[in-house]
Amino acid sequence: MAEVKPHHYDVIRRPLITEKSTLVAEQNKIIFEVAPDADKKAIKEAVEVLFKVSVTKVNTLTQKGKTKRFRGFEGRRSDVKKAIVTLAEGQSVDISTGL
């Protein structure tokens, strides 16, 4: 495996721990919030290096930010890019320990 580099920590922002993410964890999948400019190759490399696991597939999606109003002013929340990472059979990651 490759060595850990500082840009790996820039690619993966945080794991998303929701009801849905705990359900897909049973299927050997982990959901991360990633940098908006990160591509699938960079996400795969970062997960493999940081967590020392092998990744079989990476799916990404961009959740558009909502428009919100506050005291007559209209603003917009930031977009969020998520990655659903599928691990190889028999591999797991304990995301509660952190990076």
Curated annotation (Swiss-Prot):
GO biological process: translation
Organism domain of life: Bacteria
GO molecular function annotation: rRNA binding; structural constituent of ribosome
Any GO CC annotation of this UniProt entry: ribonucleoprotein complex
Signal peptide from the UniProt entry: none
Keywords from the named record: Ribonucleoprotein, Ribosomal protein, RNA-binding, rRNA-binding
InterPro entries listed in its UniProt record: Nucleotide-bd_a/b_plait_sf, Ribosomal_uL23-like, Ribosomal_uL23/eL15/eS24_sf
Subunit structure: Part of the 50S ribosomal subunit. Contacts protein L29, and trigger factor when it is bound to the ribosome.
Role summary: One of the early assembly proteins it binds 23S rRNA. One of the proteins that surrounds the polypeptide exit tunnel on the outside of the ribosome. Forms the main docking site for trigger factor binding to the ribosome.
Record-linked NCBIfam families: PRK05738.1-3, PRK05738.1-5, PRK05738.2-4
Database matches in PANTHER family: 60S RIBOSOMAL PROTEIN L23A (PTHR11620)
Family the UniProt entry places it in: Belongs to the universal ribosomal protein uL23 family.
Protein name: Large ribosomal subunit protein uL23
Originating gene: rplW
